[in-house]
Amino acid sequence: MKKFTLINKARSRIKVFEPLEDSSKKSSMINAILISYGCVFKRSSKPVMKGSRVESIEAARNEYKKLLEDGWVKTYRFNNF
């Protein structure tokens, strides 16, 4: 699973969904998702990340679906910050 970035309609806020792997086990199983959120001040600069939290996979999927329904769109612009 790779990292997904969503941006709102006004292009002022972003949320980044990335897998959180359990490093204590030998198998690289994904059991949670790290959701980071931040603000975009200029399109040409890096976003300012305000915080992050860890959610279960189901809770993260539900939030992802709700954001898409609210008009957020997937973007690749900020994947390398």
Residue ranges with predicted function:
Residues 1-66, 75-81:
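Terminus-proximal functional modules
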